[in-house]
Amino acid sequence: MAGNDVIEIEGVIKETKPNANFIVELENGARIQAGVSGKIRKNYIRILVGDRVTVEMSPYDLTKGRITYRHK
């Protein structure tokens, strides 16, 4: 899969799960499970319930995603 075959969408963290996974409610109302990207993990960026985030999703599996940015 090429690196440009991703869907980027914003959402809000609704709950936390073990191992740095989160339930994110997207702008369209859907809820997905998302993990944190490597750069967020490497730089120790804290993500809490209620934070607004940008999520990358594969067009092949719309139930999982990767958190790539936490908005201020």
UniProtKB/Swiss-Prot annotation:
Keywords linked to the UniProt accession: Cytoplasm, Initiation factor, Protein biosynthesis, RNA-binding, rRNA-binding
Subunit (UniProt): Component of the 30S ribosomal translation pre-initiation complex which assembles on the 30S ribosome in the order IF-2 and IF-3, IF-1 and N-formylmethionyl-tRNA(fMet); mRNA recruitment can occur at any time during PIC assembly.
Protein function: One of the essential components for the initiation of protein synthesis. Stabilizes the binding of IF-2 and IF-3 on the 30S subunit to which N-formylmethionyl-tRNA(fMet) subsequently binds. Helps modulate mRNA selection, yielding the 30S pre-initiation complex (PIC). Upon addition of the 50S ribosomal subunit IF-1, IF-2 and IF-3 are released leaving the mature 70S translation initiation complex.
Originating gene: infA
Name of the protein this chain belongs to: Translation initiation factor IF-1
Database matches in SUPFAM superfamilies: Nucleic acid-binding proteins
Top-level lineage group: Bacteria
Annotated family: Belongs to the IF-1 family.
Keyword Iron: no
Matching InterPro entries: NA-bd_OB-fold, RNA-binding_domain_S1_IF1, S1_domain, TIF_IF1
Naturally occurring in which organism (per UniProt): Oenococcus oeni (strain ATCC BAA-331 / PSU-1)
Cellular compartments per GO CC: cytosol
